[in-house]
Amino acid sequence: MRRPHNRRDFIKTSAAIGAGYWVAGGTSLKASISANEEIRFACIGIDGKGSSDSNDAKNNGKVVAICDIDDGFLDKAQKAFPDAKRFNDYRKLLEEMDKSFDAVTVSTPDHMHAVVAAQAMKMGKHCFCQKPLTHSIEEARVLGNIAREQKVVTQMGNQGTADSTLRLSAALIKKGEIGKIKEVHVWTNRPVWPQSKGLQVKTAAPPASIHWDLWVGGAKKHEYSPEIHPFKWRGFWAFGTGALGDMACHTFNMPFMALNLRNPTSVEAVCDEHDGVMYPKSSQIHFVFPDLDGRPGLNVYWYDGGRMPPAEVLAGCPKAKNGDREVPFNSGSVIVGEKGKLFSPGDYGGDAANTGLVFGNEFKNQREYARGVEYVRSPGHFVEFANAIKGEGAAVSNFPDYAGPLSETILLGNLALLAGKKVEWDASMMVAKDASPEVAELVRHQYQNGYSL
């Protein structure tokens, strides 16, 4: 597909991709592994989500290399993968193991996703990368372009994409069960890690087992802190993407699939104060999407840190049990149409018992509307990725057609948080109007310490 040369071409191209991936599997790919061959995986980042990703790799092939900046994590992983070569620096892994593996899993902190994935894909390696796909907006576009050019199989780690409950929800919206869509509300109970203005972290010399310079990678120099690594880096602008980046690739996923929610024209945020070091404790973000491929323009609202949609949005929706009380689900999404609403609770869109349509104040499980509704059923999110490497089917959350545009859209919310004002966005040019240098850095990173895409 040619590169769009102007805004009109860009919008047409985006609409065509969004409409076509679901049927045709998106970008044309090369199959480098036969159905009977074993896929050889190199796993980069092997604790946290890296633990489950490397285990999925083991279940769908052979893990031949493991990489982490933390020797303690490597020691633990070595017990599960005794024959795998171990590395601290992913660059050495890629150089030394080039001919010895076929695919990578990238489960590093957010700020290193793009540089690792880009280098691996440029070598012709298939890539499974954790969500959000990238730390900056441009990185998401670039990774999609590299994947398309190299014709490698890709998949982002938003596993709910493969869930039949989520896919049925999207199909019902596409079918028009609740009529013309008016607005969408999405929320999460995150953050579950410390983040707010003025929080101080204690710095120290890194333990000998932690290779801190490799952890910092392409970000600006920062002293080691046990309150950053592991896990709590999510709350720092320099390394993570906050509550929005951490969870919207899950909770925003079903509405994105159903409504092709890409390329908003403006984003505006209301949030607690923040200092540009850590993300705010809570926020509410308003995305405005234009008409696209027959889908009317609409408003999408995001809530985190305890903020919730208005009571009228949740009226008639099932509630969760909290001891003897019934309370609203602390994460989920509601799509509001002219005829009714679709309610999808939980993080991943897979709560079959409580997902359904609301007409007035009457809830009906979506399974009552499933007869005759067509959607592609997945063998499992990672299995889908492994099968696609062998030329069997397609990975839906691939970088060019799905994960990249989804991540771009989500990360625009952080742009509004940092800007502190309404952001007018030109997706074709990847430009935020009147952006400060700090805001522009969230669009296009300036890498440090010799790292690059």
Predicted feature residues:
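N-terminal secretory signal peptides and thylakoid transit peptides that target proteins
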Residues: 1-18
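Short amphipathic alpha-helix with an adjacent loop that forms part of the alpha/beta core around
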Residues: 92-99
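N-terminal Rossmann-like NAD(P) cofactor-binding module of classical short-chain dehydrogenase/reductase
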Residues: 104-105
